[in-house]
Design a protein with these regions (language model features):
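Alpha-helical lid/collar subdomain of P-loop NTPases
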Residues: 114, 158-306
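AAA+ P-loop NTPase catalytic core and its hallmark functional loops
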Residues: 1-169
Length: 306
């Protein structure tokens, strides 16, 4: 999508508003993201990511996509803490003190630009770290599980990659305008009462479990629903009750279940209740995932989302 909504730099023939950065296992603080003030040289040592953010600040009319590869090779809370705080407080990120004698074009502080969209890929093995609730509350976790038929087809003949070119038809600007509209919408769309009903049901099941969702989670679910509504209106369509149920299915899967983990005594009853409720409300994808987690709990006495 970042390429499709990309803007080509005519000088370098690259997508100027897309940056892919692999996260290293040595990212122990924010310097790999935001750089640092060098007191010996009296200048600011920038990074590709900071330069990209500043470019986004200078071009607020188009979206910018920052993609972090294998972002859990290091503790996200350590290197991404300033971003997490700015997302919550909307305050400036301080880069260096105004009292420093800094010979640099880098400003003392930056706002987190509204046209910056951050995505990260995740691998789970013995070399990676799990996400804290603070991170999970601010993200949608999308699990990619290839169909076995696709895996076998790739064994027989390697799947060819799809070449994608920027569309340059105003879609990037339209995407950003839609995102801003969704962020500014503070109420749910008409006809979405079923969403509140399902959310209340999930909340009642989670109550007292230690995995209750916070104010931010509820807000982000509302934004997700409003985004789907806005997209439907863009295409001159309306959302049915079934559509709203599917949206809540996706949000249970992407925002609630990723936080659930533990042994049988901690989450056994909780997952069983969520499985039953998902079946009652026709939350099909969540039901499948919960049952896989229950199966893992049965075989290894412990389960987690990923």
């Amino acid at each position: 999508m970042a390429t499709w909504l990309g803007k080509k730099d005519e000088n370098t023939n690259t997508i100027a508003n897309k940056l892919i950065v692999p996260v290293g296992s040595d990212w122990i603080d924010n310097t790999k993201i935001l750089g640092f003030y060098n007191p010996l040289k009296k200048t600011y040592e920038s990074t590709k990511i900071l330069d990209f953010i500043l470019l986004a600040c200078d071009n607020p009319e188009i979206p910018f996509f920052l993609i972090l590869g294998e972002m859990n090779l290091s503790h996200v809370e350590r290197y991404f803490s300033d971003f997490l705080s700015a997302m919550e407080s909307h305050e400036k990120i301080i880069l260096y003190s105004k009292d420093e004698d800094c010979d640099s074009d880098i400003p003392e502080s930056i706002d987190l630009p509204e046209n910056l969209f951050v995505t990260g890929t995740v691998n789970i093995d013995e070399t990676t770290y799990m996400f804290s609730p603070k991170v999970l509350d601010r993200a949608n976790i999308i699990e990619f599980i290839p169909a076995q038929s696709d895996v076998l087809a790739n064994f027989e003949a390697e799947t060819q990659s799809i070449e994608i070119e920027p569309v340059n038809d105003g879609s990037a600007e339209g995407f950003l305008a839609l995102a801003k509209t969704v962020r500014e919408t503070t109420t749910l769309p008409a006809g979405s009462d079923i969403c509140k009903t399902i959310l209340e049901g999930i909340s009642n099941i989670l109550d007292g479990s230690g995995f209750e969702f916070a104010f931010r989670t509820a807000k982000e679910i509302r934004l997700y629903i409003n985004a789907a509504y806005a997209l439907a209106q863009n295409d001159e369509k309306t959302l049915s009750e079934e559509d709203y149920v599917n949206l809540m299915d996706e949000q249970l899967l992407q925002k609630v279940l990723p936080k659930v983990h533990g042994n049988r005594s901690q989450v056994g009853t909780l997952l069983s209740n969520l499985s039953k409720y998902s079946e009652e409300q026709n939350l099909k994808e969540s039901k499948k995932k919960i049952d896989r987690m229950l199966k893992q709990l049965e075989t290894s006495q412990f389960t987690s989302f990923i």
